[in-house]
Amino acid sequence: MTTETEEIDMLQIQDTLVSLDLLERHFLCDLSKCKGQCCIDGDAGAPITEDERRKIEEILPEIIDDLSPAAQREIRENGVAYVDEEGDLVTQLVNGCQCVFTVFEPDGMCHCAIEKAWRAGRVDFMKPVSCHLYPVRLTEYPSFTAVNLHRWKICKCAEVLGRQKGVRAYEFLRGPLTRRFGEEWYEELAATAEEYFRQYPPED
């Protein structure tokens, strides 16, 4: 269902309010172009929960040797996470910008050390939900969760590729959205998107 406003800009799905950008914007990560730059640019780490911090600390012995010397030193001195200026718990950074769990391939592409270890079967934790969800950002309120699409210039290539392939953000993010909210929630979102586009046919 939609919120009761003269101009629709949010959709209500269960106890969440979802930005229409998630439906209308095209998005498909193009790692060949961006090289995983979202892991190394920014002024704060990735938001995590206390449970995720504990899980990262639990698997740290398995991945610590995969990290750069600077990242290992930062973790030893300051831990895997810190509270940023907005009061959010976030992953630790190297040099104030690069996530400590970033690893680089010979071609310069960035990957998440946690996810690499998970894909290799070495750990049972994929990566923080906020990383999996990106470019979606969640804001928790007492009675609902706001689901917004963060637009960043380094992701322009993902918007271009998504448009070329006809993939919208909510479709690209089916896996992480289902991980966070559940299959029933995602199916309701997809059905709502179908009805929305029936009423308001996209121009693209």
Residue spans for each PLM region:
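Short loop/turn segments that flank or connect secondary-structure elements
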Residues: 2-204
